[in-house]
C-alpha cells in the first residue's frame, strides 16, 4: 500500500524532500520525550498522506494562511503548516483525551523551538480562569489549541482560509453524519 501511495504522489521535489527531512527530525525529537527505548514511529504513511494533503491545499490557497484542523489527530497538519510557513496561523480542535494530549505535546515542542512563544491552549486559560484570547486578532505564526466543546464560542466566523478534517468522518456518530 505504501508503494501505491508513493506511486500516486509521483516524484518528490527538493522542497518536498526538505519538508520530509525536517518533519522526520521534529517527530524524532518528540518521540524522545515519549519513549526512552529508542522506539520510533513509522512515519512513511504520515509523510505520504501529508504531502498529498498539502499538494491539494496549495492548489487553493497561498501561504501564509489561517488554518483550522478539526480532529487534529497527532497534529501532523499543524507541524506541516509550521514547517511550510512560520507565519501560518493554525488552530487544532479535538475532543478526545489521547488526541488532545499528543497535540498539546507536539504544539508545545513547536513553541519551544520557535524564536518566540506563539502557542495558546484554551484549556490552560480555562484552568487559570483567564479570558480566552481572541483568535481573530492573532499575530502571524500563532498556534491555538481548542477543545471541541469550546469551539462554538471561541472559533471566529469567516476567519479561516483552510479547514482540514482528515480522517474525522469515521469518528462521527451516525447522528452527526445525517
Please report, for each region that a protein language model flagged, where it lies by residue.
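S-adenosyl-L-methionine
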Residues: 107-155
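A short acidic, Gly/Pro-enriched loop at the edge of an enzyme's catalytic core
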Residues: 153-163
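A short, conserved alpha-helix within the catalytic core of class I
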Residues: 171-178
Amino acid at each position: 500500500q505504501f508503494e501505491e501511495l508513493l506511486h500516486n504522489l509521483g516524484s518528490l521535489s527538493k522542497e518536498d524532500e526538505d519538508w520530509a527531512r525536517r518533519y522526520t527530525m521534529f517527530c524524532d525529537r518528540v518521540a524522545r520525550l515519549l519513549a526512552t527505548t529508542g522506539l520510533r514511529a513509522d512515519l512513511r504513511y504520515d509523510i505520504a498522506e501529508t504531502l498529498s494533503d498539502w499538494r491539494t491545499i496549495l492548489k487553493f490557497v497561498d501561504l501564509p494562511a489561517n488554518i483550522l484542523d478539526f480532529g487534529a489527530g497527532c497534529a501532523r497538519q499543524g507541524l506541516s503548516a509550521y514547517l511550510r510557513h512560520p507565519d501560518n496561523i493554525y488552530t487544532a480542535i479535538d475532543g478526545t483525551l489521547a488526541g488532545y494530549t499528543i497535540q498539546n505535546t507536539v504544539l508545545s515542542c513547536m513553541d519551544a523551538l520557535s524564536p518566540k512563544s506563539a502557542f495558546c491552549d484554551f484549556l490552560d486559560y480555562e484552568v487559570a480562569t483567564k479570558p480566552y484570547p481572541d483568535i481573530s486578532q492573532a499575530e502571524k505564526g500563532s498556534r491555538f489549541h481548542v477543545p471541541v466543546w469550546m469551539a462554538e464560542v471561541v472559533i471566529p466566523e469567516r476567519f479561516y482560509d483552510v479547514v482540514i478534517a482528515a480522517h474525522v468522518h469515521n469518528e462521527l456518530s451516525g447522528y452527526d453524519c445525517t
